[in-house]
């Protein structure tokens, strides 16, 4: 017998049979070795063939093991194994069967048929397991589908549809697909295209996450329920698994053979199968190698002849990039656009999916949570599409509640830790012999007893609440299964079964659910089982960093006293503080315009009056860290070409992939304070970019992505008009301030374009600082020095005269508060540093600072 006349799978089986014989110390390869290997062969056709023929495979496997155990063993030396006479006889019989059926190569199924006819022990075992020759022959005919074995790899190409596709209609029948709500127009349009005589291959095109795959699943459900035209009623909808098709294709031509097998199977089905190719663009170039043909080109003839009835799905970008370039492939498909659903449609979709998700997580999802998921995701998650992002929100919020139910409640956990701590102390005290320790042990035992009782009671409550929840979940699962059984009975027209489920099983289960729900009516103390709008808002906050959850009392008070908090750090600029505080409060209460930034301001004033300091104080107030502020020094953008740094380089330029400085920062942190410092120093083209940010709250970066600025506060600072401010300073009356503001606005209007000024929420002119305010600022700045000294365990105590001296030295109406910082450095910090180095002050000392002869003097208290 020639080995090269066996199919590759049969050759592999023979090699594995030899290994099996060697491993079991057998000197001869018997038919049982080969049959045993064929039965366990990965991807082989022997096991499916026997199952199809009604053979009891587990019983057969036991009998084969018994036969293998009974074979004689040779140990102690390595011997060559050779085929037995019985195996050779069976191979001759297999060869004869193959030739009778017109095969060029011997396939494994003829070996199975030869064994059934055999009178040996293996044949008897097979017949004892229920094998009959006629049934085996019928199963072989079905497996081969009228084809002969003409190539070595013929066995691998068999049942290609079962191997490389997923049956969506079968999944719909078993209730494994999520319900598809709405999308009637798109499904109708898809059916319309499928019903055409030619070009009957729709391709669904839309943004990621709008529900392209869901439309195909909806079509599968309609086919199963018979809610489609007559022409589609008996068809199967299969999804091509491209990963399985490519996986393990090691040699050139192997992938093409597999795809050809799929196409041949489809041709044999004569239009009874619709093939769904998700991510259609992956077919263009798949399997492409030097001199080879890619999958896209292999599909074209089948599509043109009408042998392949296909639905594709891909995104707009991928369609343009891959499919449109191949005009011959594109013309064989008919485009069906899938748009993003509205918020109202998304709410309807979520209501339809609610039961599935509630059942999966074992929690209750309330309707306000569904509405919140749709509205909040639409407003705050801008880089993804509905309904995908809303479904993800609902899913994650339900997952969070489930996690809290499964994990130990915080109160119980705290009690348990306290108990462990006390028990450790008890063990330590048991070793002590003195009376005081014995008394403490008695007290400790009493405390442990009280805590133990409290812990046991709480744990019992927690377990009973969990059990109540799980009981209701089990009933809901039974109701879901009963509904699936009812649908299956309806399709089979089994009216007796339908009547039994509809009027017997379902009402009984619903009565049980009502009883379980009434038992749950009491408020759960430790377990929360409902997903509310608040949980959805918390998930949005975690995703985006935007605080959309309900404000706690502490935060409300904090926002109401915002002016006072900012005023403690920024002195003498009450108007600016009020304007900024109002913008933050509007944003936090949801009253600000949803299509514009939370606030956009231009701060004007001379140097050193607190423009940048107010932004730092605001960042610390909002985010507990002044590092959360996005600060851009506009003096870096003085050249025309430097504008590209803000939004990213255009295509074809170096740095295109990196994105823009401003846009990337805001994409990562959408809720932030953006400070554009010294804005008048930037090139005029920068303001053209800022126009759409200030008006629509959005900016398109170099890669075409839209970046959302609607949750940012934009502050620009400028020194324009500082000369006019200095000239009119010295009088704090409202009339003078109005006159000063008008003079400054004249300068501003001369420098900035009207369309830029018109888009700002407010232009704030900062007041010059007087001596009293400089003294206040000195106190604030000295607090920083006190903190630094505290690290060295030193305290600082300045009397009023010393503070007065620093205020006088640091006061300069032209330069604001910056000279004060220099005065503190030169008058106080330099001298104090020398004193500390000289050993005048050591850890634990208090440094008393006074004035003597117009100079600061230091003494130890």
Curated annotation (Swiss-Prot):
ATP 1 binds at residues 206-213. One of its GO terms (biological process) is cellular response to heat. Residues 6-71 are annotated as: Repeat 1. GO terms for molecular function: ATP binding; ATP hydrolysis activity. Residues 159-340 are annotated as: NBD1. The keyword Coiled coil applies. Its main location: cytoplasm. SUPFAM superfamilies: Double Clp-N motif, P-loop containing nucleoside triphosphate hydrolases. InterPro entries: AAA+_ATPase, ATPase_AAA_core, Chaperonin_ClpB, Clp_ATPase_C, Clp_N_dom_sf, Clp_R_dom, ClpA/B, ClpA/B_CS1. Residues 83-146 are annotated as: Repeat 2. Residues 391-525 form a coiled coil. ATP 2 binds at residues 605-612. Transmembrane segments: none annotated. Residues 341-545 are annotated as: Linker. It comes from the Bacteria. Residues 769-861 are annotated as: C-terminal. Part of a stress-induced multi-chaperone system, it is involved in the recovery of the cell from heat-induced damage, in cooperation with DnaK, DnaJ and GrpE. Acts before DnaK, in the processing of protein aggregates. Protein binding stimulates the ATPase activity; ATP hydrolysis unfolds the denatured protein aggregates, which probably helps expose new hydrophobic binding sites on the surface of ClpB-bound aggregates, contributing to the solubilization and refolding of denatured protein aggregates by DnaK. Belongs to the ClpA/ClpB family. Homohexamer. The oligomerization is ATP-dependent. The Clp repeat (R) domain probably functions as a substrate-discriminating domain, recruiting aggregated proteins to the ClpB hexamer and/or stabilizing bound proteins. The NBD2 domain is responsible for oligomerization, whereas the NBD1 domain stabilizes the hexamer probably in an ATP-dependent manner. The movement of the coiled-coil domain is essential for ClpB ability to rescue proteins from an aggregated state, probably by pulling apart large aggregated proteins, which are bound between the coiled-coils motifs of adjacent ClpB subunits in the functional hexamer. This is Chaperone protein ClpB.
């Amino acid at each position: 017998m020639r080995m090269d006349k066996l199919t590759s799978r049969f050759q592999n089986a023979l090699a594995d049979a030899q290994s099996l014989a060697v491993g079991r110390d057998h000197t001869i390869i018997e038919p049982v070795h080969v049959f045993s290997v064929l039965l366990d062969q990965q991807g082989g056709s022997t096991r499916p063939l026997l199952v199809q023929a009604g053979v009891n495979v587990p019983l057969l496997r036991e009998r084969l093991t018994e036969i293998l155990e009974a074979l004689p063993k040779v140990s102690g030396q390595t011997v060559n194994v050779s085929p037995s006479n019985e195996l050779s006889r069976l191979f001759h019989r297999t060869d004869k069967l193959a030739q009778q059926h017109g095969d060029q190569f011997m396939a494994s199924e003829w070996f199975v048929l030869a064994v059934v006819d055999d009178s040996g022990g293996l044949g008897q075992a097979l017949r004892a397991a229920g094998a009959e020759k006629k049934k085996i022959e019928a199963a072989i005919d079905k497996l081969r589908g009228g084809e002969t074995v003409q190539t070595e790899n013929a066995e691998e190409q068999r049942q290609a549809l079962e191997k490389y596709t997923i049956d969506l209609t079968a999944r719909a029948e078993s209730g494994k697909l999520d319900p598809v709500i709405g999308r009637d127009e798109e499904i109708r349009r898809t059916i319309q295209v499928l019903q055409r005589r030619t070009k009957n291959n729709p391709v669904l095109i839309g943004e990621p996450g709008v529900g392209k795959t869901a439309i195909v699943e909806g079509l599968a459900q309609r086919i199963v329920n018979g809610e489609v035209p007559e022409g589609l009623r008996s068809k199967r909808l299969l999804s091509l698994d491209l990963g399985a098709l490519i996986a393990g294709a090691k040699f050139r031509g192997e992938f093409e053979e597999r795809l050809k097998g799929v196409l041949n199977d489809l041709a044999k089905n004569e239009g009874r199968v619709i093939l769904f190719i998700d991510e259609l663009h992956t077919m263009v170039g798949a399997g492409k190698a030097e001199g080879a043909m890619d999958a896209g080109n292999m599909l074209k003839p089948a599509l043109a002849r009408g042998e392949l009835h296909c639905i594709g799905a891909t995104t707009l970008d991928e369609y343009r990039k891959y499919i449109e370039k191949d005009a011959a492939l594109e013309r064989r498909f008919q485009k069906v656009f899938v748009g993003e659903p509205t918020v109202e449609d998304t709410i309807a979709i979520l209501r339809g999916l609610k039961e599935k998700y509630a059942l999966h997580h074992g929690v209750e999802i309330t309707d306000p949570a569904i509405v919140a998921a749709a509205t909040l995701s639409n407003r705050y998650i801008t880089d993804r599409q509905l309904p995908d992002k809303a479904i993800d929100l609902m899913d994650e919020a339900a997952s969070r509640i489930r996690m809290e139910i499964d994990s130990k409640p915080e109160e119980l956990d705290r009690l348990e830790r306290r108990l462990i701590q006390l028990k450790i102390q008890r063990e330590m005290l048991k070793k002590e012999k003195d009376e005081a320790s014995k008394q403490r042990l008695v007290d400790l035992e009493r405390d442990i007893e009280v805590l133990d009782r409290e812990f046991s009671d709480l744990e019992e409550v927690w377990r009973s609440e969990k059990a109540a929840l799980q009981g209701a979940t089990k009933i809901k699962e039974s109701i879901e299964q009963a509904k699936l059984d009812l649908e299956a009975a309806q399709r089979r027209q089994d009216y007796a079964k339908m009547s039994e489920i509809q009027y017997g099983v379902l009402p009984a289960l619903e009565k049980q659910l009502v009883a379980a729900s009434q038992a749950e009516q009491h408020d759960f103390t430790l377990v929360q089982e409902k997903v509310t709008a608040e949980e959805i808002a918390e998930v949005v906050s975690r995703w985006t960093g935007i605080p959309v959850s309900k404000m706690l009392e502490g935060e409300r008070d904090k926002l109401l006293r915002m002016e006072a908090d900012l005023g403690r750090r920024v002195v003498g600029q009450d108007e600016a503080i009020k304007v900024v505080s109002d913008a933050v409060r509007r944003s936090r209460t949801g009253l600000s315009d949803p299509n514009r930034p939370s606030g956009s301001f231009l701060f004007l004033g001379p140097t050193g009056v607190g423009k940048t300091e107010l932004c730092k104080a605001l960042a610390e107030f909002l985010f507990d860290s002044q590092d959360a502020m996005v600060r851009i020094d506009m003096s870096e953008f003085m050249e025309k070409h430097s504008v590209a740094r803000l939004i990213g380089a255009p295509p074809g330029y170096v740095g295109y992939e990196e994105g823009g400085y401003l846009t990337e920062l805001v994409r990562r942190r959408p809720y932030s304070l953006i400070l554009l410092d010294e804005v008048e120093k930037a090139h005029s083209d920068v303001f053209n970019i800022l126009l759409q940010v200030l008006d629509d709250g959005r900016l398109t970066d170099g890669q075409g992505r839209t970046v959302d600025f609607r949750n940012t506060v934009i502050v620009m600072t400028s020194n324009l008009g500082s000369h006019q401010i200095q000239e009119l300073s010295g009088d704090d009356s409202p009339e003078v301030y109005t006159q000063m503001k008008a003079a400054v606005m004249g300068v501003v209007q001369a420098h900035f374009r009207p369309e830029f000024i018109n888009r700002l929420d407010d232009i704030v002119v900062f007041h010059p600082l007087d001596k009293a305010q400089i003294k206040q600022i000195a106190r604030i700045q000295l607090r920083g020095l006190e903190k630094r000294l505290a690290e060295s365990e030193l305290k600082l105590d300045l009397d009023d005269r010393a503070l007065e001296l620093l205020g006088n030295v640091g006061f300069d109406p032209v330069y604001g508060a910056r000279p004060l910082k220099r005065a503190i450095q030169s008058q106080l910090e330099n001298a104090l540093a020398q004193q500390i180095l000289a050993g005048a002050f050591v850890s634990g000392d208090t440094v008393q600072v006074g004035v003597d002869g117009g100079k600061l003097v230091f003494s130890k208290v």
